[in-house]
Structures are given as structure tokens and as C-alpha cells.
């Protein structure tokens, strides 16, 4: 009888990607079947995030619920992974001794061996090391789940912003080899994936090794991925303005597969606060980057991250942030109240902005972003948008839903055979959280590239070590 696995995920798209790899790995090596409820599982894994406040306490609350399951099922294996595990491994072992496995983001590929050790009664297993890119060499072929997919291109970050724990929990920047990334994308395209999102803590700094000993920049990678037939839409997260080069901007000019949507975190609109955050750029530099992008992509919409109430943030600093929001006309944002992260330089700064002030500023900022988002949405009425159809609408299963290039959800009446493909839809109504449209045409009437097998995009060459490498044709 097959063993059952339950994975609970908190945090960013990278964590979602890692969790999917855990499930694929354990299925391919040991036949584990994923289940929705922890009560039904033989192994439960918690993939954690340490970015937000009280992340550690949130973990222990969840583990407390799982402890009760273990009372009734003594052989249940409980594992904690992700950034909290990497940062607080000792605390987890101390406060939750019933946890069997503690593993970091870079050691998830060792899960089959860790679980085996626990099941053989060899005690608790802890591995939160940083074995660079080793985990990608040990993972199975990707499995597509719909028309969209995430592909990790690098791990870690070397920027050391004063508020951020990522360099301490995921390590410094390590890029996957170019061939590995292209092969994974081609394998996903073979399975019907049409849209790929490239993932990394700072994708702009990607420098992947090539088969001939050279390196590939992020701009070059974007063009390579866009050239794979079947991949008609390309996204990426997350970016850092200091690595957003002219070469990347040039890709927006000549690569239509790259969507008209960019998430480029700025965090604050005050140069003084940006310096305290150690962001490495100014407001003027950020504005200049967006202006040059809009010159080559006038229809581009932009989203960002904002930290509210960073130490010593004054009313004037916040007003400057609001000025930047208006100037750029951000479509959406991920905005949060500042909270100290243990081990970061900012944790040594006095947290001198009151919670009430932080909440007031956050409400003002989010209200402004919402107004701008609604304004951008209203301008879409009457336009024809290309939609990647994701499936039936949640509100009406007789209708379809999909996303525009600028990440808006659109509901419309159409043929369910369109699921997984593209349609053109005229936008008729705009609501706060969704858009309604009218079907105009399907893929048969579009001028998309002729579909060929994505595996033909790469040529397989065997080197002297009998190791396959994959080189763009």
C-alpha cells in the first residue's frame, strides 16, 4: 500500500516550487501519494517562511496541532523545512522534540534518506547546510500541473539588505547552469505548459554556467527560454533594481513572450530610508529604470514591495513613498508593516515608529494602490486582451477564467476545450477582484508560432564523461 504525504506551504513562489519538488521527489523515489489532509498522511512536511513577524510562533502553533496527530499515530513522520528551519533549527528541536526531521531549503533533495533514517529508528535528523546547487542535481523530471509552471533558476541572495533574512536562511547567490534550466523548461513545454515563471531571490543577478565554460546573463537566459516553442508567455520574480541592466530592458523591446508586467521591489520612496535599508540605489535611479522600460513597452504595468514603518521613518519619508507610488502609478503591491528579523542589521536599530502609526500609513498606502489599480482596470474596458485559460471559473463552472499579461483574472463564456490555451477576450466589465470579458477568437485564429516538439529545441551532446548537456539549437 502506498505511503501518503502531506505538505503544508507558507511563503513565496520559491517555497511553492520547493514543495512541489518535495512531492515529486518522494513520489518518484518511494511512491508517496500526496493527500490534502494531514490526518490522512504517513509523512507531514511544513515548508516555512521567515520573512514576516512572528514566523517562529506560527510554526510552533502548527506543530502543536500535528503533535496531537502523532499521539494517535506514533509512526507519523513530522518534518520542518524552509527558512524558519534553517534559521531556528535548534529552537525547533528544543521546543518540539517530537519533530523528526529539520531540513533547510538547500537540503530538501535529501528527504528520502532522512525519512528512511527516521523510520529505521535512527533518531532525529537535522540538515540545514548550504550544499550550493546540489539539490537540483538530485530532483526528478518536473511534472506539469496545468498550463503554467515555476522554474527556479538560482538560489540565495548576496545583497544583504539590512532588513532581510534571505542571505542567512538560503545562502548567497548560486545560479543553476544554463543547460539545466533550459532542459527543465523544455520538459514542461512537452507536457503542455504555455507560461513559465522564472524564480529566484534576485533573478537579475543570474550568471549560469554554459557547456563551454562561459556564463550566461539573465538577459540572455530570457531570450533562450522565450525561444522554446510552446512557451508563449514568460514571467520572472523577484528582481532587484541595482541589477536591472540595460540588457534586460532591451529584452522587453525584442521579446514579445516577456509579459507586459513587472514586479520590481523598491521598498520605500525616501533616499534616506533606502540608504538605511542598504538597498544600493536611489529613488531617481528607480524612476529612470521604469521610464526607460516604458519607452520600449508603453503598455507595461508595474508592481512593487513596500515596507512601512522602517526604523526612523518620518512622516516626510512616508510622504516621499506616496509621491513615488503616484509617480510610477503602481498597479499592485505587496506592502507590510516592518518587523524586526532576528540576526539582521536592522534588528539592532531602534524600532521607533509606533504600531498605530505603521497601521495608519499602511492603510493609506494600500488605499492609494487600490485606487490606481482600479483606474488601470477601467482603462482596459473595451480593449482586447490575450488570456491564458486556466480552467473553469470559481464562481460559475459553466464559465472559464484566465489571466491577462498584467495578471488580471478574467471570467468569460467559452468552450472548455480552450483550457490550457490562449484566447482573445474583449474586456466588458471591471470589478475590484476580477474582470468580465467576451470571447473574440481562439488559438486557431491567432498567429502563434508553429508548434514543434520542445525537445527538438535542444540538441543532446555526450561529453567525455558520458554526461548529457543541452545546448540551444
Curated annotation (Swiss-Prot):
Disulfide bonds: none annotated. SMART domains: Elp3. The keyword Protein biosynthesis does not apply. Binds 2 [4Fe-4S] clusters. One cluster is coordinated with 3 cysteines and an exchangeable S-adenosyl-L-methionine. [4Fe-4S] cluster 1 binds at residues 12, 49, 83. Its cofactor is [4Fe-4S] cluster. Residues 3-120 form the MTTase N-terminal domain. [4Fe-4S] cluster 2 binds at residues 157, 161, 164. Pfam families: Radical_SAM (PF04055), TRAM (PF01938), UPF0004 (PF00919). Its EC number is 2.8.4.3. It catalyses: N(6)-dimethylallyladenosine(37) in tRNA + (sulfur carrier)-SH + AH2 + 2 S-adenosyl-L-methionine = 2-methylsulfanyl-N(6)-dimethylallyladenosine(37) in tRNA + (sulfur carrier)-H + 5'-deoxyadenosine + L-methionine + A + S-adenosyl-L-homocysteine + 2 H(+). GO terms for cellular component: cytosol. The keyword Transferase applies. Catalyzes the methylthiolation of N6-(dimethylallyl)adenosine (i(6)A), leading to the formation of 2-methylthio-N6-(dimethylallyl)adenosine (ms(2)i(6)A) at position 37 in tRNAs that read codons beginning with uridine. Belongs to the methylthiotransferase family. MiaB subfamily. Monomer. This is tRNA-2-methylthio-N(6)-dimethylallyladenosine synthase. It comes from Psychromonas ingrahamii (strain DSM 17664 / CCUG 51855 / 37).
